[in-house]
Amino acid sequence: MRKIIIGSSLLFSILLAVPQAHAQESVDVIIHDNGTERREVIDLPKSMTYPVDSLLNDWKAKNYIDLGKDCSTSIVNPEFSDSIYIDRLSRMPTVMEMPYNEIVRKFIDMYTGRLRNQVAFMLSACNFYMPIFEEALDTYGLPLELKYLPIIESALNPSAVSRAGASGLWQFMLNTGKIYGLESNSLVDERRDPIKATWAAARYLKDMYAIYQDWNLVIAAYNCGPGTINKAIRRAGGKTDYWEIYNYLPKETRGYVPAFIAANYVMTYYCKHNICPMETNIPDATDTIQVNRNLHFEQIADVCGINMDEIKSLNPQYKRNIVPGDSKPRTLRLPINYISTFIDSQDTIYAHRSAELFKNRRTVSVANTRSTARSSKGKSSPQGEVIYHKNTQRRKPCRPSHAKYGVTVNQIKKLEWHEQHQN
């Protein structure tokens, strides 16, 4: 039996930062096993619940993706036998295994059935993101089929945010992102940066493979966290095959690997199911410049004449439309034909509406007023000094504050216990 040896420092950091599965919708699957049938309820990944209209709301999608005139997705979805699915999956040029069973079939049917318009959108959105994914995965020597993991995570929606707080194409949780170098604060969230998040995801996946040496376990851990996977392995008696620990996994994670296999299938064989990619126009070329001072998107839009939504789409990591260049040099991405305009007009841009857009004060003065109020402990002198008098009277016993407010000592101890454990 293969044993999994986990580096303690790496695993401890990751365990503190992994996302937890959150159910969105469920699907029923009938599983046949040794002549018997059983009903399996699986929670769907949230990405499979996004309506196509919401995916098309992104600025890039609005401007570069449309339904197309020459090719439209048919409502007719051909039915194929299990043997055909098995053959097609086995012929895919992948390092990761792509096995077939009733659960995988259920997810294939969903992608090629009621989610076929979503697939048509994602096929087009691949033109924006797949080159980024493939470069990072190839650099780290990872299987290129992992490029379809964001299909399960976010449906290639760069603005996706889960109820658990995961964000971006790769749905990084806040702490996981920080461990892998993604800055997050009130103004910046690099989990939303497609390029930086992709390279962070590649490092994370490589670290997970160093632990498990099994890609099914790696992508399952990406969904529910290595702590949950390790617990499932222990409950399964030390087995390290995803399908053998399947029943010990959370409901959503049970569907995560089958959904990943189905995503690889549908992105390869979409034509066999009469799915046509939406028409994609080539986006305008862009370039980056370094910003060393605080800068607001509205300053750029007003002076350079760039569409505000386009600036937001090109720089999704800046949460409040502010590039905080004062803290450290920052990268700003703009259409390439506006780069020279920005450079030539920098002084004008930085000065434009700066007092209106940046209202936080650098220094403040304390009001120079004298108090005329007197207390039992002192009084003001003519020069403004406070003269204190020692009170030598014996103090009366104070009534405990918990008695005053009707709170018991045990209740206070419980609150303190919870606070300590939360901290």
Spans of features found by a protein language model:
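Hydrophobic h-region of N-terminal signal peptides that target proteins for export
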Residues: 12-19
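An acidic, Gly/Ser/Thr/Pro-rich helix-cap/linker signature
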Residues: 3, 7, 19-140
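Short glycine-biased active-site loop of nucleotidyltransferases that positions the nucleotide triphosphate
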Residues: 160-162, 323-324, 421-422
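Glycine-rich active-site/cofactor-binding loop and its immediate structural neighborhood
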Residues: 145-146
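Extracytoplasmic and endomembrane cell-envelope/extracellular-matrix remodeling and assembly machinery
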Residues: 75-121, 127-128, 139-140, 184-187, ...
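Short, surface-exposed glycine/acidic/tryptophan-bearing loops
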Residues: 102-103, 160-181
